């Protein structure tokens, strides 16, 4: 068993039917899940740090810390079910979110990461929620899919729409027919040195 197979075996859920799809590389599928687990851990840890800011009477940082900890628990719930085996409804919630498209998860993670940063801008909220935001960005990129092959992009660029003539590619092609070229007749006059 190779190292990659061991890692994917650790990060795979039991009876998982490859919800992301076969078109995604294994390192992106499991890397996003690993990033989500690490992000959730640090969000909970730094959210707790923000909660302790009540000592300085900063209520907005207290609220931001609570929101950040809840966001960390939600991300941990969706990414690492093994941490919540004692709760029966966790599987139902995770399966429901897994059945949604990837852009739903991306939007959820990004939306959960923004309020703590706005309420209490500091290293703790920036790093903890920033990792969740990064996980949402990775899921968003996975939702966009991979880029088309070079042949497909060339074919799409050369298609004509509605009987239009294909685009001209020479240097003399202009937007307006019969347009006169720019001409410079000499050096620009000097300034009055003011």
UniProtKB/Swiss-Prot annotation:
GO terms for biological process: bulk synaptic vesicle endocytosis; cell competition in a multicellular organism; clathrin-dependent synaptic vesicle endocytosis; photoreceptor cell differentiation; positive regulation of neuron apoptotic process; positive regulation of presynaptic cytosolic calcium concentration; synaptic vesicle endocytosis. This is Calcium channel flower. It is found in: Cell membrane; Cytoplasmic vesicle, Secretory vesicle, Synaptic vesicle membrane; Presynaptic cell membrane; Endosome. The lineage of its organism: Eukaryota, Metazoa, Ecdysozoa, Arthropoda, Hexapoda. Its main location: membrane. InterPro entries: TVP18/Ca-channel_flower. Belongs to the calcium channel flower family. Transmembrane protein which mediates synaptic endocytosis, fitness-based cell culling, neuronal culling, morphogen gradient scaling, and calcium transport. Regulates synaptic endocytosis and hence couples exo- with endocytosis. Controls two major modes of synaptic vesicle (SV) endocytosis in the synaptic boutons of neuromuscular junctions (NMJs); Ca(2+) channel-independent Clathrin-mediated endocytosis (CME) in response to mild stimulation, and Ca(2+) channel-dependent activity-dependent bulk endocytosis (ADBE) in response to strong stimulation. Channel activity is inhibited by La(3+), which reduces Ca(2+) influx and thus inhibits it's function in promoting activity-dependent bulk endocytosis (ADBE) in response to high stimuli. GO terms for molecular function: calcium channel activity; identical protein binding. It comes from the Eukaryota. PANTHER family: CALCIUM CHANNEL FLOWER HOMOLOG (PTHR13314:SF2). Pfam families: Cg6151-P. It is a multi-pass membrane protein. GO terms for cellular component: cell projection; endosome; presynaptic membrane; synaptic vesicle membrane.
